[in-house]
Amino acid sequence: MITNQQFNDNIEEFISIMLANLKLKGTDFEFSVNNNYVNKWNIDKMYSFVSVSVKQLRIDFTISFDDLYGVPLLNMRLYDNDTFLTSPMAQRTLAVGICRVDLHNHHLLQQPWLQVHPCETLQTIDSHLKNTPTCKYNSVIQYLCCWFGLYGLPSIFPQFSVRPNIYINNVQSCKIK
């Protein structure tokens, strides 16, 4: 479990690690990061914005902290040839992963975005992090890497993979999946 303040203190480092380790697997297509930044929303809320493109598809996503569930939250918008896919059905057609995804108003930006539902995230991440090896990063970065692997972009688009080796060198097979 992490707090909003811990999220705020670590989001920039996490985004840097995530972008350095984001891969597109099982395809010859390349992807590009068009834009990324971390923004302070108000006195105590921060979020990151990342935009990636694969051929004509653009995925804009934010990572923020949801106070109600006490977990990070992924919101995204999809574009085809720079045309915003406004219909929820068109959005759902392209989001083919295993997480529950709904169209909601972004809790900070107050515009319609697809949202990976945060239900059960807290328990899932806590159980994944039980008995983990010593991490070469702080525990918040470890938590965010685990969360992103399970509930972030790869959960919706399994072609994306992020597998940073966050553990101390001599530990075998400890990459976040």
UniProtKB/Swiss-Prot annotation:
Transmembrane segments: none annotated. It comes from Candida albicans (strain SC5314 / ATCC MYA-2876). GO terms for biological process: autophagosome assembly; glycophagy; nucleophagy; protein transport. Induction: Expression is decreased upon fluphenazine treatment. E2-like enzyme required for the cytoplasm to vacuole transport (Cvt), autophagy and nucleophagy. Acts as an E2-like enzyme that catalyzes the conjugation of ATG12 to ATG5. ATG12 conjugation to ATG5 is required for proper localization of ATG8 to the preautophagosomal structure (PAS). Likely serves as an ATG5-recognition molecule. This is Ubiquitin-like-conjugating enzyme ATG10. Pfam families: Autophagy_act_C. Belongs to the ATG10 family.
